[in-house]
Every structure is written in structure tokens, then in C-alpha cells.
């Protein structure tokens, strides 16, 4: 306890003002702080928050520039890119507006829901957006979450990951992006309320509501379950952008059922609708379809921006293999170069790889595993042999022959080698 020389009057431990010189003196464990020092600390925190926001908002690209950068990494999905670019741009402009103190019009936060098949680029879009904006980013799997008090992960642990990504800079973390994958897996199990508690479905949706809308959450810095004796980090989620994604397998049937409902008795209309692809059907998505699927209305209400991603076709998968900055074939070619080797893949092989991914219904995500399987033995050998050229053909992909390995005549490996051969004009 800090007192003056006569031990009659308490003083502030920070500015040394006496109790009668300030309005309030708040006691803590062996220390005191006055109201003036509290105000000063508050002003410092606000100023730090403004600086962190200015660093972000000053570098926000326009929606068109965001789309252009996304095109370098993500193939196709033009409409989804446009919607995301506008949504993210408006989100961070909103933060700038709120921070300015101008409150004549209240601007609400607009979280985003991405709906699309596995491997269509949902996660990559979210990751690339965070990279473009240079903000803290974290991903969470909704299937690992449960309600507080049950075995599993609390929703607050998502915020802890964001804090870790921001190196525990609270002001920076409060302007970050959180991507929650597999939200379709936390749909309630049926339309009717059950007497048994759905702790990993509707219960998780309920738990996510507050942090998605905006609240000051108590985050345990060590992770794990909360208990009264531990310290907490207070994190305001009002300005955190939440992007949720999911495949929503079967929602196309719900949409078809709704759109066909008014056509009962008119078989021709039903048959026409059946001929539509899933990509076309998803364009007709309505809020009621998500409710029917198992998302509660309150959860959907926290995700006002909803966009669908198309299933990737063979041409798109081939483009993903070769064209983006982080193209999978380019990555493997670089790995071979590091071993003084060369990798060549002809176009027929790329077609066969894309067709395999389509059959497996794994989208772009399955391309790497297919290539890894094809190149495993070659990567095992070239590390010892060196100066080798590995050629992958359609027959190799089909499992008819082994990859062709030949000695490289020229040892000048810094010369650009073709990634693929025989590309159609």
C-alpha cells in the first residue's frame, strides 16, 4: 500500500497526487490509481487503436484492385470475387468512418457466407484477402466447436488464434479477419426442436451469434476452458470481419424442391429444372433454403452477404495447375530445381489429372494429392541422382508406365524450362 510520509493520506502510485487532489482514487493490490491517470491510459489506448486503424485503412485497395490481385491466385469465381472485394472494401471504410467519430448514420457490420463445393476456392479467397489487406487472419473448423461446458473447443478459442496471429496486439486483432470453415456441419439436425441438446449444431450457432455481431469477449490467453481464477484478455469483436464457408451438400435438393413446388402437375417445368446444373440451381438460393438446411434465422441474420461459388470444371482445374502465381505445377518444378533436376508435364497428363480430381469430387484441393502420388518415387530418386529430367505423360497418370527419367544434357539449370508441353493454342 502506498501512503504519504505521515501515513494519513493515500496517493496515486502513478502520478503521486494525493487523494484530496483528485476526484477518485481506486485501490488495487498494494497500489492506487487516480481518475486522471485512468483517463490518460484510456486516451493512449484510443490513440493506439487509431494508429492501427490508419495503417490498415490507408492501404485499402479499391474493389477493382482487390479483384485484380485475387485473379493472380484464384481461378474463376468472378462474381464471388466481385462481391467479396466490395464487401471487404466497405467493411474497412466503415471502420474508418466509425473511428472518425461521425455517427449521423450508423453503419452495420456485414459478415460474409461463402457457399460452394469442396475445392472451389472458399478458403483460398479468405486467405488471399487477408494477405492483400495485411491484417491478422485465422481459420477455424466449425466441426471442432461445442457449446461452453461441453467437451470440445469454446468459440472464444477462435479469438485466441486471432490474437496469436496479431502477436497479441489487441488493437490490431480487433481489425482482423476470421474464417470459419464447415459451417454447414453445425446445422441443426432437424427442423423440429429436440428434447436433447444439440451441443455441436444449433448450440454452436447460438454461441457464435454474440462474437459475430459484436461484443467484448473474455479470451483466456492460455487457451482451454474458462475458469474463475484465470486472467482474461478483453477483445472487442465489433470490427472483426467474419467469413463463413461451407459446401452445404444437399442444399440444391432443397432449392429444387422449393422452385418446383409451384409447378406440381406440370411435369415439363420439373424436367426443365432437373436439367439445370448445381451451379445454376445455387444462383436461386434464398434465405428460407438455408433455414430449411438447418441454420437458425439469427445466425443467417449475422451473415447478410451471401455468395455462391461454382463447381470447377476440367479447364479450370488445368488452369489452377499451371497459371496462378502459386500454381501447383510451378511449386513442384521449383522443388525439382532445388535438387538440380527438371520437371516436364505434357498437356494430356494435365487433362488426366484434372479428370481424376473431377471423379473424386475433390476439386482443386485434390490436385496436390494426385501430383504428390505421381511424383513420390521421382522425388525420392532425383535427390541422389541429380541432373535428371522427369517427364509425366497421360500414361503415367493412368498408371500404365513409370515417370520417364533422363539425364539433362545441359547443366545450366537457371535456364527457364517449360512447365508443360503441347499446350493447345
UniProtKB/Swiss-Prot annotation:
SUPFAM superfamilies: Glucocorticoid receptor-like (DNA-binding domain), P-loop containing nucleoside triphosphate hydrolases. ATP binds at residues 117-124. One of its GO terms (cellular component) is HslUV protease complex. GO terms for molecular function: ATP binding; ATP hydrolysis activity; ATP-dependent protein folding chaperone; protein dimerization activity; unfolded protein binding; zinc ion binding. Keywords: ATP-binding, Chaperone, Metal-binding, Nucleotide-binding, Zinc. Residues 1-53 form the ClpX-type ZB domain. The keyword Electron transport does not apply. The keyword ATP-binding applies. One of its GO terms (biological process) is cell division. Zn(2+) binds at residues 12, 15, 34, 37. Gene3D superfamilies: 1.10.8.60, ClpX chaperone, C4-type zinc finger domain, P-loop containing nucleotide triphosphate hydrolases. InterPro entries: AAA+_ATPase, ATP-dep_Clp_protease_ClpX, ATPase_AAA_core, Clp_ATPase_C, Clp_protease_ATP-bd_su_ClpX, ClpX_bact, P-loop_NTPase, Znf_CppX_C4. PROSITE patterns: CLPX_ZB. Disulfide bonds: none annotated. Belongs to the ClpX chaperone family. Component of the ClpX-ClpP complex. Forms a hexameric ring that, in the presence of ATP, binds to fourteen ClpP subunits assembled into a disk-like structure with a central cavity, resembling the structure of eukaryotic proteasomes. ATP-dependent specificity component of the Clp protease. It directs the protease to specific substrates. Can perform chaperone functions in the absence of ClpP. This is ATP-dependent Clp protease ATP-binding subunit ClpX. It comes from Rickettsia prowazekii (strain Madrid E).
Amino acid at each position: 500500500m502506498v501512503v504519504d510520509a505521515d501515513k494519513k493520506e493515500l496517493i496515486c502510485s502513478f502520478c503521486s497526487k494525493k487523494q484530496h487532489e483528485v476526484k477518485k482514487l481506486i485501490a488495487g493490490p498494494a497500489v492506487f490509481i487516480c481518475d486522471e491517470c485512468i483517463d490518460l491510459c484510456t486516451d493512449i489506448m484510443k490513440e493506439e487503436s487509431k494508429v492501427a486503424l490508419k495503417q490498415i485503412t490507408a492501404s485499402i485497395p479499391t474493389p477493382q484492385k482487390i479483384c485484380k490481385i485475387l485473379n493472380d491466385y484464384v481461378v474463376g469465381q468472378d462474381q464471388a470475387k466481385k462481391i467479396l472485394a466490395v464487401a471487404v472494401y466497405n467493411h474497412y471504410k466503415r471502420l474508418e468512418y466509425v473511428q472518425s467519430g461521425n455517427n449521423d448514420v450508423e453503419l452495420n457490420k456485414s459478415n460474409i457466407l461463402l457457399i460452394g463445393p469442396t475445392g472451389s476456392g472458399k478458403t483460398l479467397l479468405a486467405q488471399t484477402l487477408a494477405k492483400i489487406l495485411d491484417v491478422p487472419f485465422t481459420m477455424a473448423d466449425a466441426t471442432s466447436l461445442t457449446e461452453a461446458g461441453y467437451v470440445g473447443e469454446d468459440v472464444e478459442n477462435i479469438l485466441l488464434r486471432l490474437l496469436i496471429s496479431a502477436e497479441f496486439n489487441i488493437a490490431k486483432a480487433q481489425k482482423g479477419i476470421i474464417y470459419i470453415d464447415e459451417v454447414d456441419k453445425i446445422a441443426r439436425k432437424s427442423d423440429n426442436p429436440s428434447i436433447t441438446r444439440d451441443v455441436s449444431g444449433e448450440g454452436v450457432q447460438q454461441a457464435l451469434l454474440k462474437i459475430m455481431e459484436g461484443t467484448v469477449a473474455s479470451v483466456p490467453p492460455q487457451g482451454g476452458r474458462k475458469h474463475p481464477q484465470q486472467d482474461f484478455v478483453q477483445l472487442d469483436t465489433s470490427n472483426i470481419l467474419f467469413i463463413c464457408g461451407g459446401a452445404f451438400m444437399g442444399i440444391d435438393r432443397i432449392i429444387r424442391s422449393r422452385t418446383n413446388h409451384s409447378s406440381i402437375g406440370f411435369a415439363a417445368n420439373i424436367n426443365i429444372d432437373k436439367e439445370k446444373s448445381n451451379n445454376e440451381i445455387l444462383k436461386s438460393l434464398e434465405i428460407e433454403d438455408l433455414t430449411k438446411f438447418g441454420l437458425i434465422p439469427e445466425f443467417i441474420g449475422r451473415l447478410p452477404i451471401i455468395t455462391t461459388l461454382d463447381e470447377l470444371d476440367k479447364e479450370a482445374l488445368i488452369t489452377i495447375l499451371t497459371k496462378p502465381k502459386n500454381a501447383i505445377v510451378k511449386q513442384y518444378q521449383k522443388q525439382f530445381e532445388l535438387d538440380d533436376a527438371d520437371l516436364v508435364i505434357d498437356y494430356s497428363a494435365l487433362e488426366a489429372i484434372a479428370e481424376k480430381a473431377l471423379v473424386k469430387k475433390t476439386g482443386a484441393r485434390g490436385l496436390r494429392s494426385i501430383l504428390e502420388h505421381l511424383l513420390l518415387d521421382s522425388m525420392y530418386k532425383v535427390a541422389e541422382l541429380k541432373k535428371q529430367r522427369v517427364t509425366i505423360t497421360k500414361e503415367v497418370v493412368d498408371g500404365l508406365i513409370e515417370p520417364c527419367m533422363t539425364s539433362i544434357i545441359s547443366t545450366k539449370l537457371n535456364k527457364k524450362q517449360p512447365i508443360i508441353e503441347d499446350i493447345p493454342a
